[in-house]
């Protein structure tokens, strides 16, 4: 009866390889490698808006979905400010939020966004395949999604995931 232990052992090895092969935090996205969906946003009063043409302006950029009620959005905000301070264009999409709360959030923490719009009903988020906030996309200069990252942008994520995607996006321009 050596066959059952060998079969079990082989299965255990394959399962172990499968578990450690991919990033367990990475969520699949059918959008990567595809053109960004249409930008259909409501104006954020007092802020510059962006549109489809902005995503195809020849410049690599980040698009960040956020909300004032989102604790991880608050946690990632200093990292978005730092990326913006480095000259990386960051475009914000305020997701299903009260305007006053969103405005207070930016007044308190700072505004890292080159331009911003509001997705009040979450309809645009459906087209983008949003899982939840925060969520950040790396977009190349032709408007192609290079990376979709679900979750807060930490310093580790910037170095291991965002910067390599920005470099890849710059190479595809």
Listing of model-derived features with the role each one plays in the protein:
Residues 1-42, 173:
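N-terminal targeting signals for export/organelle localization
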Residues 62-64, 92, 138:
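Hydrophobic beta-strand core positions in alpha/beta domains
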